[in-house]
Swiss-Prot record:
Spans through the membrane: 8-28, 39-59, 68-88, 103-123, 132-152, 162-182
Organism: Geobacillus sp. (strain WCH70)
GO CC terms, sorted: plasma membrane
Source organism phylogeny: Bacteria, Bacillati, Bacillota, Bacilli, Bacillales
Pfam families: Mntp
Keywords, ordered alphabetically: Cell membrane, Ion transport, Manganese, Membrane, Transmembrane, Transmembrane helix, Transport
Listed name of the protein: Putative manganese efflux pump MntP
Family named by the database record: Belongs to the MntP (TC 9.B.29) family.
Amino acid sequence: MKMFIGELVALSMMAFALGMDAFSVALGMGLFRLQLKQIFYIGIMIGLFHIIMPFLGMFLGRFLSYQFGSIASYIGGALLLLLGIQMIVTSFKKESDRFVSPMGIGLIFFAFSVSLDSFSVGLSLGIYGVRILLTILLFGFFSTVLTWMGLMLGRHFQQWLGAYSEALGGSILLAFGLKLLFSF
């Protein structure tokens, strides 16, 4: 039970870190005064992609772990480390350089692009051997809720919090990557 709680806390922190990416972009979208129905659909779509993408990543990660053993764990840690660095660097780009319209095919493209990092994390976690169902449900839940929060708070806080929220998420992934690399 104690081990499950530890895994739950670690996975929740990771899900929060990934959700911060969606949150930071949603803050920018919140400036467009979206209707509540649109906000609901955007959050659901991003949540679904944050379930599908890490699931695919974990499936591939488990395969690699089975084939390559302990070397795969180092690869997983390195991927998390690189992803964390990439999120921190991206957080300092202009918000206008990253914006995609959140309607129709633009919403699907947006949800896919925001969830690409969760594929990489899923790959790392698949190598590490975490519980798949728990992981994808946490990733979906956190990304959906954080997207909704970002959209709702966007009009008020986007200018001072936008870049920092993604940098925080990147820092958390960076820390988990370092933990995986140096725990063997």
